[in-house]
Design a protein with these regions (language model features):
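Short, well-ordered alpha-helical segments
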Residues: 2-40
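Acidic pyrophosphate-coordinating catalytic loop
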Residues: 48-55
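C-terminal edge-of-domain segments
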Residues: 57-71
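Short connector loops at helix/strand junctions that flank enzyme active sites
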Residues: 6, 37, 55-61
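Generic short beta-strand segments
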Residues: 43-47
Length: 71
C-alpha cells in the first residue's frame, strides 16, 4: 500500500482588516481549486500603506499543502 502524496503551492492574499483575515481569504481562494487542504504555512506578511486613501492593506504570502487523491 502506498502512502498518500502531498503537494503544495504558494499564493498571496490581502485584507483591509488584519493578517488573520488575509489568511482566511487565502484559504477561501485555495479551496476553490483543490480539496484535502492539510495546512497553510505563512511565509511572509507585510502591510501596504495607501496614504492617499488613509488605508492599510494586510498581505500574506502562504504555502498551501494538500493531499493528492488516491486512485
Amino acid at each position: 500500500m502506498v502512502s498518500p502524496g502531498y503537494m503544495s503551492f504558494e499564493l498571496v492574499a490581502t485584507s483591509e482588516k488584519d493578517w488573520k483575515d488575509a489568511v482566511i481569504e487565502a484559504y477561501n481562494a485555495a479551496k476553490k481549486s483543490v480539496y484535502g487542504i492539510r495546512s497553510i504555512q505563512i511565509l511572509e506578511r507585510d502591510v501596504k500603506v495607501k496614504e492617499d486613501l488613509d488605508k492599510l492593506i494586510y498581505r500574506v504570502r502562504v504555502r498551501v499543502n494538500f493531499q493528492i487523491a488516491e486512485k
